[in-house]
Structure formats: C-alpha cells, structure tokens
Amino acid sequence: MNQPIEPDHINVPTEALESLRLRLTQVSHSLNTLQAQLHQPTLPPWSSLHNQFNVLLTQLVSLSSTITHQSDILQQTVTFPLPAFPTATEAGLMATLLRKKILPEVEEWCEEVKQKALGVKIRTVDQYGEWAAETVEEAKQEYEWYGLMTREEVDNGVKPPVYVAPEEEAGEGAKLTIEQILQFTCAGKMPTVA
C-alpha cells in the first residue's frame, strides 16, 4: 500500500521563518519603491528620496537584527523537497532554492569588497574628530556665512541686499505689536511700522 507521507511540521521554526519572511518582504517592497522613484522621468525631491532611503536602512537594520537573533535556529534548519515536488520539470528552481553556496557573482563582489577593505585604515575617535573638523572647515570656505550668498556670488561681485530692520527705519521708539511679530514668525510677512 502506497500511502502519502505526511510532513512533520513539529520541528519547523515557523516563528523564525515568518519573521524573516516579513522583514525580507518589507525590504523588497522598499527597494521596489525606491527604484520606481528613481526611474521616473523627473526625479522626486531629494527629501523624498532621503526619507525612502532612511526607511530602507531601518528595515535593513531590522532584517539584520532578526537574522542575528534567529541565527542558531536558521543554521540548524535543513530544507528538502517533499516527495510530490516535480523535480523533473522544476530542477532549476529546486537547485536555486536549496543552494547553500553563494552565487559566483556575489562571491566575486564579496571578495572585491574584502580586498578594498584591506587598504582602509581604521581611525581612532581623535583622528576622526580631526578629519571631521578639517572637512567642515573646507566646506565653510565654500560659502559666505554672513548672508545668503555663495562664495561664487561674492567672487563675481554680486552685491548683497541690504536688510534694514523696521525699528531702524522708524527710529528708536518704534514698537511692534504681538500680531506683527506672530505674522512675521509664522508667515514671513514683514511688519510695517506706522
């Protein structure tokens, strides 16, 4: 008598696999969303890309944490096809799903990154602080920090606008009402002093 073999689901780490599947689905969705944004005829604002990238990074951290937390269970889990799996017609799919070795392209990429990392010197906190201070100073030199002009505009002789506060126009005794101050802070409306 040929009875179908019932799979034993007792030792399957369902919780670990489900949490991993959920995290992978989230990362896949975020990557697709980011790719769709980048392939639009006009790029979206950088803030939108930045937000999507931050979401993706958060999800990658969550995925990494899940893998680390479940690593013992996942390393001990062995997968195999059920007897009813069509191995003759789906041999390629089965080989891909059961693959233990990294794809050759991924292995080459990992080796390339390892080789590049060999030349990188890890900095101490003090060295990093010095480098950051130098980088900020270099960036500071690119701008005129006393107004709304770039270094290029200053070098080209563009004259900065002269801003005169309403009190200076009206004299020493001029006072602004609370409504005028709130209109300026909330809407940017310049107050007029009578």
Swiss-Prot record:
The keyword Transcription regulation applies. Pfam families: Med8. Its main location: nucleus. It is found in: Nucleus. GO terms for biological process: regulation of transcription by RNA polymerase II. InterPro entries: Mediatior_Med8_fun/met (IPR019364). Keywords: Activator, Nucleus, Transcription, Transcription regulation. The keyword Transcription regulation applies. One of its GO terms (cellular component) is core mediator complex. GO terms for molecular function: RNA polymerase II cis-regulatory region sequence-specific DNA binding; transcription coregulator activity. It comes from the Eukaryota. Component of the Mediator complex. Component of the Mediator complex, a coactivator involved in the regulated transcription of nearly all RNA polymerase II-dependent genes. Mediator functions as a bridge to convey information from gene-specific regulatory proteins to the basal RNA polymerase II transcription machinery. Mediator is recruited to promoters by direct interactions with regulatory proteins and serves as a scaffold for the assembly of a functional preinitiation complex with RNA polymerase II and the general transcription factors. Belongs to the Mediator complex subunit 8 family. This is Mediator of RNA polymerase II transcription subunit 8. It comes from Yarrowia lipolytica (strain CLIB 122 / E 150) (Yeast). The gene is MED8.
